[in-house]
Amino acid sequence: ITNTALNNGVKGYSRLEACNKGNVITLSDTIGGSPVFYQEKDFIGFAHLKMLIPKKNTLPDFDGLVGRYIAVSIRKSISGRYNYTTKLNTGNILRTKISLPCKDGLVDTDFIRKIMTEEQKRSAGLVLDYLRSFSEQ
C-alpha cells in the first residue's frame, strides 16, 4: 500500500509476508488529495503511510463497512485542506474532527452498517442498469 490517492492505495502485490495488519484505515502525510482508505487485508506499507487502528474498547465491532464509512468521513473532512505544501501530518490528523452517528454515547455501528449496506445495494443497482443498457442496444 502506497501513498497514492488511487486504487485504494494499492501499488501492487507481493509474495513477501505482510508486515502490517489489515482492518485499519490508511492515509498519507506526503501528498495532497484525499488518500484515505480502509484496508481489509494485511499489507506491506510504504514510508509516509499512516495507520488509524481502531481501539477495541471504543469500536469493538470495527469491520469493513464501518471502516469504509469512517474513511469517507475523514476524506470529506480533510478535502481541500491539505496539499503538497500543507501536509496532513500526525498533528493535523489528530486535530481532524469527523461526525459519526452515535447511540447512548457510542458510535452506532449498527446504523453505519445499515447505511453502508443500503448504499452498496443502490450502487450495485446503478451498475446493473448501466450494464443492461449495453445489452439492450
Regions found by a protein language model. Name each.
Residues T2-Q137:
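Charged, alpha-helix-forming regions
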